[in-house]
Curated annotation (Swiss-Prot):
Record protein name field: Apolipoprotein E
Record's subunit section: Homotetramer. May interact with ABCA1; functionally associated with ABCA1 in the biogenesis of HDLs. May interact with APP/A4 amyloid-beta peptide; the interaction is extremely stable in vitro but its physiological significance is unclear. May interact with MAPT. May interact with MAP2. In the cerebrospinal fluid, interacts with secreted SORL1. Interacts with PMEL; this allows the loading of PMEL luminal fragment on ILVs to induce fibril nucleation.
Function: APOE is an apolipoprotein, a protein associating with lipid particles, that mainly functions in lipoprotein-mediated lipid transport between organs via the plasma and interstitial fluids. APOE is a core component of plasma lipoproteins and is involved in their production, conversion and clearance. Apolipoproteins are amphipathic molecules that interact both with lipids of the lipoprotein particle core and the aqueous environment of the plasma.
Coiled-coil stretches noted in the UniProt entry, renumbered to this chain: none
Gene symbol of the encoding locus: Apoe
Signal peptide, first to last residue: 1-18
Modified residues (Methionine sulfoxide): M135
Major localization listed first in the record, in broad terms: secreted
Sequence segments annotated as region (Homooligomerization): 258-310
The record's account of how the chain is modified after translation: APOE exists as multiple glycosylated and sialylated glycoforms within cells and in plasma. The extent of glycosylation and sialylation are tissue and context specific. Glycated in plasma VLDL.
Region 8 X 22 AA approximate tandem repeats, residue ranges: 72-247
Length: 310
């Protein structure tokens, strides 16, 4: 009977401990391909560390360092989201205005929800810091428990809204990629039947009247084909501009990397220039000291030998 009670007690204690531990194993369910996703992952990782409520977290919460770090990560994330959204807007091309407005509205709403979640989190941590300061040395275990529960709920909400924003941006991106193709296809679908009708009418006319009409139909067909080719060329030019823009960005990043490498080499050379004279001076002093010791030793030995002979 005692053994049974011991097993039950251990089970209850294990359940209580598991309920009190913060859930810090959640991961965002996508690859961090875009800069805004990478920035959000940095925010997410920092929040996971805050949720542990370790002694270091408690200390940094009380001196507002945590809220400052979260503010920087929030601003970085939202800046990257805005930049990515602007880039997609420029790539939409010939898309219907109502489609453009609808996609932009959906992305804007998802972006606003994610920003509100981050702001709510920062305000809650600031509130916790103020509450701890008012406790005046009393136990803050209840405050930590409430904060831990609130952080778990906010992490779930953040994950939900972040994934929703990612899906909205994916739809936006698909619209940007397919916009030009849809525009060219729509023009071809509208003009194709007209060209075919002109050919059929020309074939049905008599030999005496058909030739002028055939010539006009041919000219019309040529103009239509020229227009289609022009639209296609514009779409290709737009894609080429996008590729050139990406290449320019990559080139700038390589240039910045090279500048950082050169600065590091310059700094290394400066350090070497600073310390080499010190090392050489120490070597000279050490050599002089060794010479003095050797001279003193030789002097002592030379004076002791005659005394032994006497």
């Amino acid at each position: 009977m005692k053994a049974l009670w011991a097993v039950l007690l251990a089970t209850l204690l294990t359940g209580c401990l598991s309920e009190g531990e913060p859930e810090v194993t959640e991961q965002l369910s996508w690859q961090s391909d875009q800069p805004w996703e990478q920035a959000l992952n940095r925010f997410w990782d920092y929040l996971r560390w805050v949720q542990t409520l370790s002694d270091q977290v408690q200390e940094e919460l009380q001196n507002s360092q945590v809220t400052q770090e979260l503010t920087v990560l929030m601003e970085d994330t939202m800046t990257e989201v805005k930049a990515y959204k602007k880039e997609l807007e420029e790539q939409l091309g010939p898309v219907a205005e109502e489609t453009r407005a609808r996609l932009a509205k959906e992305v804007q709403a998802a972006q606003a929800r994610l920003g509100a979640d981050m702001e709510d989190l920062r305000n809650r941590l600031a509130q916790y810091r103020n509450e701890v300061h008012t406790m005046l040395g009393q136990s803050t275990e209840e405050l930590r428990s409430r904060l831990s529960s609130h952080l778990r709920k906010m992490r779930k909400r953040l994950m939900r809204d972040a994934e929703d924003l990612q899906k909205r941006l994916a739809v936006y991106k698909a619209g940007a990629r397919e916009g030009a193709e849809r525009g060219v296809s729509a023009i071809r679908e509208r003009l194709g039947p007209l060209v075919e009708q002109g050919r059929q009418r020309t074939a049905n006319l008599g030999a005496g009247v058909a030739q002028p009409l055939r010539d006009r139909a041919q000219a019309l067909g040529d103009r239509l084909r020229g227009r289609l080719e022009e639209v296609g060329n514009q779409a290709r030019d737009r894609l080429e501009e996008m590729r050139e823009h990406m290449e320019e960005v990559r080139s700038k990043m390589e240039e910045q990397t090279q500048q950082i490498r050169l600065q590091a080499e310059i700094f290394q050379a400066r350090l070497k220039g600073w310390f080499e004279p010190l090392v050489e001076d120490m070597q000279r002093q050490l050599a002089n000291l060794v010479e003095k010791i050797q001279a003193s030793t030789n002097s002592v030995l030379s004076t002791s030998v005659p005394q032994e002979n006497q």
